[in-house]
Amino acid sequence: MATLQQQKIRIRLQAFDRRLLDTSCEKIVDTANRTNATAIGPIPLPTKRKIYCVLRSPHVDKDSREHFETRTHRRIIDIYQPSSKTIDALMKLDLPSGVDIEVKL
């Protein structure tokens, strides 16, 4: 038996600000649902933490250090059975500049 492979769009989002990321995910899911496509997600992925250690003093004191950290929050949204209306609506969607988007067909 031959099974038909479903069409799927996978959208991967990254941002430093979690609230920006969540609002972007809501916009994408609402847009997909309005065009009669099935949206699954947002699926949260593990948060990446990058810690930087910096010396406080410009001279000798090696004991005095300061730590800074960046957190990268990530989400995945799968859209099944997309139509041409779905793709056009997603292309016209205006998302904040702090959100990194990667789309795979």
Curated annotation (Swiss-Prot):
Classification via InterPro entries: Ribosomal_uS10 (IPR001848), Ribosomal_uS10_CS (IPR018268), Ribosomal_uS10_dom (IPR027486), Ribosomal_uS10_dom_sf (IPR036838)
Keyword annotations from UniProtKB, A to Z: Ribonucleoprotein, Ribosomal protein
Keyword ATP-binding: no
Biological processes, Gene Ontology terms: translation
SMART domains: Ribosomal_S10
One protein family per Pfam: Ribosomal_S10
PROSITE patterns per UniProt: RIBOSOMAL_S10
Entry GO terms, CC: ribonucleoprotein complex; ribosome
Ribosomal protein among keywords: yes
Record-level Gene Ontology MF annotations: structural constituent of ribosome; tRNA binding
Function, in words: Involved in the binding of tRNA to the ribosomes.
Subunit structure: Part of the 30S ribosomal subunit.
Family: Belongs to the universal ribosomal protein uS10 family.
Protein name per UniProt: Small ribosomal subunit protein uS10
Taxon lineage: Bacteria, Bacillati, Cyanobacteriota, Cyanophyceae, Nostocales
